[in-house]
């Protein structure tokens, strides 16, 4: 961790002035979710880009007093750099709508839909967007056998960054009765699909490109693989037939429009090996901005520097009436 990251962690509010007279940006990050660390790492690059662009930047570590802090500093715009609960689930956008402060990223309903795997799935299926078979299992069900034929995926309903995601393969010594539901009373059990991991970056409704994830160490694209060098190889642009590449772009833009997203979004797909069928895994309305994050990498391929990416995100800041 560098000195700048340590500085952000040690101070709940850090004021960084660029001195050029541009708008005042409140950079809200950290927070109380399991994705706090990822959010803080993202905020380092974002804050540097904002300062480079000439903005006055105030860093706020999200807490229960967020409304008071925002009233005190009175920013022109909030850059929502949170991941997970309270920032990515629509809570912070709801507060900012009430306070009439323009903010980056998606609004209340879009954020809430994307964050909740049950409701996003229902919405996508109603709009003919293909997803893997799944069921919801509750702790109170007291299931003592595999709830689905192996291999299957265990997903918390409301977590990002693959936190809490497990893949149960045929050979695994795993007994479902021992699963302790660490991230809530309900989980999604989803059919595991073997195939190409494909990621699409979108900005303001336009798909920028497709990237393929090639796993080098772990069996699936988990938290460790996402945030550590040497665990995966990124191939950008993804090596796909032109018609399939175009289909991914079109499908991603359809998903973006379906839940009325705003700003940057990352859509995750799997291309099944045997059937060449495309499945949507999820949509992320708060994609990471870390050095290993996918949206900045695809944006760079599309000719958009990290600083320009942040500027475009700021340009779309608004609140909902």
From Swiss-Prot:
Q: Where does ATP bind?
A: 148-199
Q: Which pathway or pathways does this protein act in? A: Cell wall biogenesis; peptidoglycan biosynthesis
Q: Which UniProt keywords apply?
A: ATP-binding, Cell shape, Cell wall biogenesis/degradation, Cytoplasm, Ligase, Magnesium, Manganese, Metal-binding, Nucleotide-binding, Peptidoglycan synthesis
Q: Which cofactor does it need?
A: Mg(2+); Mn(2+)
Q: Which residues form the ATP-grasp domain?
A: 121-315
Record-level GO cellular component terms: cytoplasm
Coarsely, its chief localization is cytoplasm
| Known function | Cell wall formation.
Record PANTHER family: D-ALANINE--D-ALANINE LIGASE, D-ALANINE--D-ALANINE LIGASE B
Protein name as it appears in the record:
D-alanine--D-alanine ligase
Q: Which organism is it from?
A: Rickettsia typhi (strain ATCC VR-144 / Wilmington)
């Amino acid at each position: 961790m560098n000195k700048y990251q340590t500085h952000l962690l040690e101070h709940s509010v850090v004021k960084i002035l660029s001195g050029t007279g541009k708008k005042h940006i409140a950079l809200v990050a950290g927070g109380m979710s399991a994705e706090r660390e990822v959010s803080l790492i993202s905020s380092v690059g974002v804050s540097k880009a904002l300062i480079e662009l000439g903005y006055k930047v105030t860093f706020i570590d999200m807490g229960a007093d967020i409304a008071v802090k925002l009233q005190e500093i009175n920013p022109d715009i909030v850059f929502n750099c949170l991941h997970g609960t309270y920032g990515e689930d629509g809570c912070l956008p709801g507060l900012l709508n009430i306070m009439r402060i323009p903010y980056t990223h998606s609004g209340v309903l879009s954020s809430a839909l994307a964050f909740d795997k049950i409701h996003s799935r229902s919405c996508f299926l109603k709009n003919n967007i293909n997803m893997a078979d799944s069921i919801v299992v509750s702790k109170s069900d007291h299931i003592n056998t595999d709830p689905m034929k192996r291999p299957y995926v265990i997903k918390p309903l409301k977590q990002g960054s693959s936190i809490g995601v497990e893949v149960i393969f045929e050979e695994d010594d795993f007994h479902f009765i021992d699963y302790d539901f660490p991230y809530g009373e309900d989980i999604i059990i989803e059919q595991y699909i073997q195939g190409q991991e494909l990621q699409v970056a979108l900005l303001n409704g336009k798909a920028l490109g497709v990237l393929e994830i090639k796993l080098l160490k772990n069996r699936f694209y988990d938290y460790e693989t996402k945030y550590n060098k040497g665990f995966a190889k990124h191939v950008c642009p993804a090596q796909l037939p032109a018609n399939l590449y175009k289909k991914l772009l079109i499908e991603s833009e359809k998903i973006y429009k379906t839940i009325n997203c705003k700003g940057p979004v990352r859509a995750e797909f799997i291309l099944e090996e045997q059937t060449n069928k495309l499945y949507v895994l999820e949509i992320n309305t708060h994609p990471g901005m870390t050095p290993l994050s996918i949206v900045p990498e695809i944006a760079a391929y599309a000719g958009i520097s990290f600083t320009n990416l942040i500027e475009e995100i700021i340009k779309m800041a608004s609140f909902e009436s």
